[in-house]
């Protein structure tokens, strides 16, 4: 009888000990990283790989008392110890075992090509690729009315207004997209809409056909980045030049040089920039060597810049666009006496009065549907929108 009680006691003690060990291990897993992290933090990768600002520590005040719990949770989630280390480990496992990305906005394609397949209201690259977001007749009418209104008002101010649409990378290099991502229909949203808008006499131009002509001969987009490279942007710049000035420079007239290895923003989003760095950075050389362009003004983040040149064309160009407009800075300033670049984060109508451009280029990449559709609001706004985050 006593032996049974002793055995039962030993079993209970063993079970209790096991529970204590598990609880202790769990508590240690929560506490130890926080305790150890300050000592090793300087030796770890702390870079922000997300396309947003990380949450800041909440304001500890009576006025902000109700918001402190949720703001602290957001702060802790963004700054949790060893976050990049754990994210990188999970990403590697997902890529090696499943050939999938742990980041929903990044699709891993064939030969490790990375694609930005964001799927949000106003910016739905996945729907663009799958062709599931075609415009309705009413939407196309509203879009045509908005572009017509902007164009007419620009003409009244003596400005030539043109809109260019740069294709998403997967629209040019669809052969590298995974077969599991199905495509429905024969035309994308812009494949269907842009010819109709152009047929109405509206100054809307599709850059995809010109890029597709060279896509098999040259690599026009970065492998691990969502943007076109210098070769792709050169082709885009010459389409703009041909449209506005009636002249352009063919690829055969410039030199294309490999300037070293390249990674990209999509690799950084996966926290795999070091592993995905075998792409090539191409540089265009000997473009209009007889013209010299210099930077006369540029803000800290390069979202606003002014160039002057000794071009025989004494006109002023204003380029307003998303991140795809950035690489045009290598080429467009040589075509005008003055060229002003402003991203959508810096542009306001006041720039029209300040610089009085002769030509106005409004450039968006295919996925930036909202900025394409809201052209009338964007062009005439009097203040810069606040950034998220």
Where in this protein do the model-derived segments appear?
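Extracellular glycan-modifying ectodomains
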Residues: 2-389
């Amino acid at each position: 009888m006593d032996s049974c009680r002793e055995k039962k006691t030993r079993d209970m003690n063993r079970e209790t000990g096991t529970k204590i060990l598990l609880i202790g291990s769990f508590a240690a897993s929560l506490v130890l990283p926080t305790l150890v992290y300050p000592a090793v933090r300087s030796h770890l990768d702390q870079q922000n790989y997300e396309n947003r600002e990380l949450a800041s520590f909440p304001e500890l005040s009576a006025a902000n008392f109700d918001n402190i719990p949720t703001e602290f949770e957001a702060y802790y989630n963004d700054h949790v110890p060893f976050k990049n280390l754990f994210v990188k480990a999970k990403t590697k496992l997902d890529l090696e075992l499943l050939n999938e990305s742990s980041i929903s906005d990044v699709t891993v394609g064939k030969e490790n090509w990375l694609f930005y397949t964001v799927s949000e209201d106003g910016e739905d690259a996945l729907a663009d690729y799958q062709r599931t977001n075609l415009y309705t007749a009413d939407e196309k009418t509203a879009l045509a009315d908005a572009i017509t209104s902007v164009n007419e008002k620009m003409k009244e101010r003596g400005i030539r207004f043109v809109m260019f649409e740069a294709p998403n990378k997967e629209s040019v290099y669809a052969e590298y997209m995974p077969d599991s991502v199905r495509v429905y229909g024969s035309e994308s949203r812009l494949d269907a809409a842009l010819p109709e808008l152009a047929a109405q006499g509206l100054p809307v131009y599709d850059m995809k056909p010109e890029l597709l002509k060279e896509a098999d001969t040259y690599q026009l987009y970065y492998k691990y980045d969502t943007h076109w490279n210098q070769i792709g942007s050169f082709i885009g710049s010459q389409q703009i030049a041909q449209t506005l000035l009636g002249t352009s420079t063919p690829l055969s007239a410039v030199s294309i040089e490999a300037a070293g290895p390249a990674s990209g923003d999509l690799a950084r989003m996966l926290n795999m920039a070091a592993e995905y760095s075998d792409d090539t950075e191409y540089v265009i050389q000997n473009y209009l060597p007889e013209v010299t362009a210099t930077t006369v003004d540029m803000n800290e983040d390069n979202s606003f810049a002014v160039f002057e040149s000794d071009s025989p064309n004494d006109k002023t160009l204003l380029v307003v666009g998303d991140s795809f407009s950035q690489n045009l800075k290598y080429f467009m300033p040589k075509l005008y006496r003055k060229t002003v670049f402003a991203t959508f984060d810096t542009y306001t109508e006041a720039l029209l009065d300040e610089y009085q451009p002769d030509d106005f280029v409004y450039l968006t990449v295919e996925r930036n549907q909202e900025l394409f559709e809201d052209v009338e609001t964007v062009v005439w706004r009097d203040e810069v929108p606040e950034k998220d985050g």
